[in-house]
Swiss-Prot record:
Protein name (record): Methionyl-tRNA formyltransferase
UniProt xrefs under Gene3D superfamilies: 3.40.50.12230
Keyword Transmembrane helix: no
Pfam families with a match to the protein in the record: Formyl_trans_C, Formyl_trans_N
Residues the record lists as binding (6S)-5,6,7,8-tetrahydrofolate: 114-117
CDD domains, per database record: FMT_core_Met-tRNA-FMT_N, Met_tRNA_FMT_C
SUPFAM superfamilies cross-referenced by the UniProt entry: FMT C-terminal domain-like, Formyltransferase
Organism: Corynebacterium efficiens (strain DSM 44549 / YS-314 / AJ 12310 / JCM 11189 / NBRC 100395)
NCBIfam families (UniProt xref): fmt
Domain of life: Bacteria
Function: Attaches a formyl group to the free amino group of methionyl-tRNA(fMet). The formyl group appears to play a dual role in the initiator identity of N-formylmethionyl-tRNA by promoting its recognition by IF2 and preventing the misappropriation of this tRNA by the elongation apparatus.
Length: 315
């Protein structure tokens, strides 16, 4: 099939590469405009744009797909000229307007990293870890006017491991989902896919903000563990110590807590080799800490460097 791929960040690159390597023809790519990154705040193309350019594929970078914008009109004109059979989508980052939904015979097919209708929205991987789900997956569905409400074309399941960070899980889903997306394109072309409506209770995973990533030390230890893993690496779980905001890496698994006193939520206890924090249940052992303006470091090394007061407590 002739495909116009829509995607932007690194997880979408895996799917684009799989489509390029498949029997299908990627004739163009839609992606977000260049963004400023790094200390110099210089403009950089998206990960998807870089891959497409390396393969000589046309790249279109609209600021909006709305029909009343210059970019929106350009996209409509170009799609009419390209005549794609389908538009696969992976984390594109822009709203597909109603009048564009029928621009191709097979429509727009989104690869979403959850088992819909669970975790509709922008952050399904983080939501699944935070909620303590043991099973998630990926869904290819046809985009309609709703928020991830379209008919399901294909799915796969993926077990969430007890130590998975959002990055760990997203990486596995990106690779497995890329194969699923290619198979879905092939199935649509062959006419072997039977779309089905979504059933069951819907849950939602809105975009995560920095405020959302703050750690609440009053909740049970297992909830804090999931919270930290769900926000690793970005935006990064964080807490306050005095007036400093510290990022907190995944916790260290400990089987027992020798010589660790009873700790109130947030209270710190440092030994030679470890740093413990009180929670709403049992204390937890910190793995890594990132002080302001510095890189992640071993929590025990950090504690020695700042000479923790016996009354020190995270807020």
């Amino acid at each position: 099939m002739r495909l116009v791929f829509a995607g932007t960040p690194e997880p979408a690159v895996v799917a684009l590469q799989k489509l390029i390597d498949s029997e299908h023809e990627v004739v163009a790519v839609l992606t977000q405009p260049d963004a400023r990154r790094g200390r110099g705040r210089t403009l950089h193309p998206s990960a998807v744009a870089e891959l497409a350019q390396a393969h000589g594929i046309e790249v279109i970078k609209p600021t909006s797909l709305k029909a009343d914008t210059g970019d929106g009109r350009l996209v409509r004109q170009r799609l009419a000229e390209l005549q794609p059979d389908c538009l696969p989508v992976v984390a594109f980052g822009q709203l597909i307007t109603r009048d564009l939904l029928d621009v191709a015979p097979h429509g727009w097919v989104n690869l979403h990293f959850s088992l819909l209708p669970a975790w509709r929205g922008a952050a399904p991987v983080q939501a699944a870890i935070r909620a303590g789900d043991q099973l998630t997956g990926a869904t290819c569905f046809r985009i309609d006017e709703g928020l991830d409400t379209g008919v399901i074309l294909s799915t796969l399941e993926e077990t969430i491991q007890p130590t998975d960070t959002a990055d760990d899980l997203l990486t596995r889903l990106a690779y497995a989902g890329a194969d699923l997306l290619v198979d879905t394109m092939t199935g649509l072309e062959a006419g072997t896919i039977s779309p089905r409506e979504q059933t069951g209770e819907a849950t939602y995973a809105p975009k995560i903000t920095t405020v959302d990533a703050r750690i609440d030390w009053t909740v049970p230890a297992e909830v804090i563990d999931r919270h930290i893993r769900a926000h690793t690496p970005g935006p990064g779980a964080w807490t306050m110590l005095d007036d400093a905001r510290l990022k907190v890496g995944p916790l260290v698994t400990v089987t027992d807590l020798p010589d660790v006193p009873t700790l109130n939520p947030g209270a710190l206890h440092a030994t030679r080799d470890a740093v413990y924090v009180g929670t709403g249940s049992t204390p937890v052992a910190l793995g890594q800490i990132q002080p302001p303006g510095k890189k992640m470091m071993n929590a025990a090394d950090w504690a020695r460097g700042v000479h923790l007061d016996q009354e020190a407590s995270f807020e």
